[in-house]
Amino acid sequence: MKYISSKVSLLLMCLLLVGGIAQAEAVKGVKQKPAKKAELERCRRGQGSAELNINNVRARINTSGNMWYDGSTARYFVPKDGNSTAMYCAALWIGGMDANDQLRVAALRFGQDGDDFWPGPLTVDRNASIDKSVCEKWDKHFIITRAEVEYFVAGFEYAADNKTVIGIDASRATDAIKNWPAHGDVSKNQSKFLAPFFDQNGNGVYEWEAGDYPYYDLSGELCPAKIKAELPAGSTYTPTPTFESNLENPNYGTGGSLEAYGGLLVDQVLKGDQTIWWVFNDKGNAHTESKSENPIGLEIRAQAFAFTMSDEINNMTFYSYEIINRSTFVLTNTYFSQWVDPDLGCAADDFVGCDVERGLGYCYNGKATDGPGTGAYAGNPPAIGIDFFQGPYMDPDGRDNPKVDTNAFIDFYGAAALDAYRDSVGNINPILLTDDAYKWKNAWYPKSKDPIDACAINGVNFGNGIVDDERFGMRRFIYYNNDGTANNGEPDKATDYYNYLRGIWRDGKRMCYGGDGYNAGSAGYQEGIYSDFMFPGTSDIWGWGTASNGNEDVGKTTPWTEQTAGNSADD
């Protein structure tokens, strides 16, 4: 039997807008006793932290699995030199069913109830295991900047072919370059490859002395759009696999009995002007946060990164996760989410909502001024957004799924409007049509109501001329109340986390459109009209979030916000 480990890549953006899942604050800082006991001889909670600080944001990143939080207070400062924070805490939630129909969940919040994640890579020997010494060794971050790599590469001497490196300037190599965590410990059955690096000679060994370097795509050679544009007409774009997933080069692969599958180098390479890289897992100890009896066997390579720019990107931070299933079983009905607790200055006067078209969750002030409190924002209060803009790759179907549905286009705009996108023989050029997609929003939702093509609304890589590279955007936006006993309150066990991942309340009830989404007596609540996106305002012009039971018109015609629900601005 051939065993493989599968990979998923996720990319999240966090941005502050001046002038995933949301949570509140009543129990923050209150230590609760875990119902499930961690084992002392196994991994302890990660103690490491680092700071993303290259632009106008100063954000704490923890090795324990969450971020923006130091165990008691918020550490996401915008502006970086101020004392106001826009975020409180965030972490990954992942859950699915194994072949025996057993639920497996890995999720974390503040860590007050316990832990589900620990530092370090897992083994690739079909056991997906880790011990305390490995967790402790990897309880740290690796911080690098694009500028120091560019400076190092600028000192290379090349052969006549202008490609082969024949000399380097060692004085240009920083400690971060010299000590890059490119490899796991194969003697301990870890993967041969961990942090991405550019391999000059293809020998599968990180040798900075020979011109290898932490892999920023400096030339754009991995960019799918660039590669596609340079291919001969009719050619198929084939993405470059990661070293682990590259089974053609005998120097690559995991170095263990469990092969890797599905990883793409364009997703794995380093991003940003400043990058924090680290690796963590869900097998280091008992899951005392989610209380999941069954761990998954996930190895997660993470990046936190940011850019220095003169525009809004200077107020943004980004997060990329390469999620690898090191176990030998396949999870089905699997869901991924970024759990986020935003506190915009003063935590007691906030609202949340989402923009379905943009795939964006956001938090905004419920009053004209923020506060009171020393951490409140002065003047016109800002808003903060969280964009889950590159989710998991969708299952392949052999198509370049369209961004614009031509049948819906003809119904709304008429066939003649398509003529501008036809080639000399009358065929529609999907790339040209995609380039103008924002002119034709009514045609984003397919006339067939195909659930796959509908994901083009806020997914990415639709109609780009490349087959099977489509990725999910935001498919749910939910919140829960700060009540550990209510059915729309805080999660307490694995089934609660899994229900929230699927857009279902703790008691299994579907979220409904309007009001608070749960209670029939709340203002605007519409029983039986199920909703995937809570508080979308008027952004779901297609009624996509209510289409599962044929109620598209509700989302198109009835605004839904925390204000229309009669909620009070709070945490």
Language-model features: where?
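Extracellular/surface-associated beta-sandwich interaction domains
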Residues: A24-D571
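Bacterial N-terminal signal peptides that target proteins for export
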Residues: M1-L11
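Short intrinsically disordered, low-complexity coil segments enriched in acidic
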Residues: K2-Y3, V18, A569-D570
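N-terminal cationic amphipathic segment used for targeting or macromolecule association
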Residues: S6, G20-A24
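Bacterial N-terminal signal peptides
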Residues: S9-G19
